Curated annotation (Swiss-Prot):
It comes from the Bacteria. The lineage of its organism: Bacteria, Bacillati, Actinomycetota, Actinomycetes, Micrococcales. GO terms for biological process: lipoprotein biosynthetic process. This is Phosphatidylglycerol--prolipoprotein diacylglyceryl transferase. Belongs to the Lgt family. The gene is lgt.
Length: 272
């Protein structure tokens, strides 16, 4: 007998005249968790009680746009024969996490400079919250029928419903990549917190090391998961952008961790 993960029972529900997608519910829950965790951590680190709310609200649109753009560019063939508005239909799913990270990071440094906030201190506070929010987003992917893998005979294989998967053998089972990534994210959160409490505070690691570790560890994790991931559509460039993005995350993480050495050899107590 095969103990599989069943298809999602629902994709959403009616709230009066409004149809609410489960994907949206989990995305909202993730955003709230990200804000709460980051705000608490940043208050402990700096005493600043206002900046987190400003940063999260200011970065919301750039992050969504970057994530959506990454998804569309990664799956151009999916939209070639679709109505143009489908490019913007984020309620149907399709946000590329890596694109959101980089668009948010670029915009964040701008607002941090304007507000005169130590950027790497905030990024350290932010890192665990990003991963926690992504766990909720991956649950939303399950309800949207996204982020699954290739066929598997493992007992925790994912069973897909017929709707939307006519090109697949729905009698088979597939790797639940969304679940693997949730486990990966929780594992990285634990590592980050241990490093923060046991290593970074006792040594000369610069501020930003927690965020740098997040980028490197998540990038490595994506490299491990991508070969198992099933892509319903490919982009028109013959290039898997998720590998490129994962490599970029690792490189940026290493540069952030080494920036003091590269620039002037400053230590942690020299500030941001």
């Amino acid at each position: 007998m095969h103990f599989y993960i069943p298809p999602p029972p629902i994709s959403g529900f009616w709230l009066g005249p409004l149809y609410v997608h489960m994907y949206s519910v989990f995305m909202l829950a993730g955003a709230l968790v990200l804000f709460e965790l980051t705000n608490r951590r940043f208050i402990v680190l700096t005493g600043n009680r206002e900046f987190t709310a400003f940063a999260v609200t200011s970065l919301l649109i750039p992050v969504i746009l970057g994530a959506r753009l990454w998804h569309v560019v990664s799956h151009t063939q999916m939209y070639e024969h679709q109505p143009f508005y489908k490019v913007f239909a984020i309620w149907e799913g399709g946000l590329g996490f890596i694109g959101g990270v980089f668009s948010g990071l670029i915009c964040f440094f701008v607002i941090a400079k304007i507000k005169k906030v130590p950027p790497f201190t905030f990024l350290d506070a932010l890192a665990p919250g990003i991963l926690a929010a992504l766990c909720f987003a991956r649950l939303g992917n399950y309800f949207n029928g996204e982020v699954f893998g290739t066929e598997t005979t493992l007992p925790w294989g994912l069973k897909l419903s017929h709707e939307g998967f006519k090109d697949l053998n729905v009698e088979k089972y597939f790797h639940p990549i969304f679940l693997y990534e949730i486990i990966l994210n929780v594992f990285i959160i634990v590592i980050l917190l241990v490093l923060e409490k046991r290593v970074f505070v006792k040594t000369v690691f610069p501020k930003g090391s927690v965020f740098a570790a997040f980028l490197v560890l998540y990038g490595l994790g994506r490299f491990a998961l991508e070969p198992m991931r099933y892509n319903l559509q490919q982009n028109s460039f013959g290039l898997d952008l998720n590998y490129v993005g994962a490599a970029a995350m690792i490189i940026v993480g290493v540069l952030i961790a080494c920036r003091h050495t590269i620039a002037s050899g400053k230590l942690r107590n020299s500030g941001d």
